[in-house]
């Protein structure tokens, strides 16, 4: 991975890590499914009038929108509704990286080398340490945990659809994909909000919306979605899934740090240890070969 693409990947990690703080702020005044629906509404409109429809099969576009957008966030919000702590959900959701690599090996016959497997194993240990730290003193409903894993699997399926889309076109328009795929989850989210959150709650939330919620929506739509998914999709189309997907493991690290700084939450020793293990695993997985090549040239 080039330095430029590495920087872009880390930018997405920071944006998505801060996303959890923004979501928490936005949910103070608006129910989750409505917030998610409005997020994608802002992504699609008015941009859809200025961005050409992507030249990809409709089935792939539908699959992408229903998995990475609606499926991921519908399962995630239901998990939190059924008792899954939001912080722990942000960690368990990172299982998408391993689902993506497994699906990549099955669908695209991508081969993982031993150095990558070692890095992934180290990162998995780090995630488990973070989860153990978050589970300490908390009661977790099994339904919430399983729904969070379903959200992670939906995200991974979306990554695979994205890879297929990128393979379909030699020069894919990433922003076109992001904008047009945002159309797909709008109706499912709004219908789900109407059924699960109620018309009265929706009306009250819209009538009393404040500037904090508006700014949260703008961040979720234009920064986390258009910028974040646009860059992420381009990287998945340019590199093997095993190089890109594990980078998302840094998202909960940024999430924990930003929550500590912006929300006053504290990091325990176990959380710090987990973060270090994840970063070490990512270094081995993503940069291991480049270090060896550089060493050979220098020698």
Curated annotation (Swiss-Prot):
> One biological-process term from Gene Ontology?
amino acid transport
Residue ranges constituting the EamA domain according to the UniProt record: 14-132, 153-287
- Cytoplasmic-side positions: 1-6, 53-59, 109-116, 161-175, 238-243, 290-299
Task: List, alphabetically, the SUPFAM superfamilies matched.
Answer: Multidrug resistance efflux transporter EmrE (SSF103481)
Question: What membrane topology does the UniProt entry give?
Answer: Multi-pass membrane protein
Q: Could you tell me where this protein is found in the cell? A: Cell inner membrane
What does the UniProt function comment say about this protein? May be an export pump for several amino acids and their metabolites, including cysteine.
Query: Which protein are we looking at?
Result: Probable amino-acid metabolite efflux pump
- Organism encoding this protein: Salmonella typhimurium (strain LT2 / SGSC1412 / ATCC 700720)
Designated gene of the protein: eamA
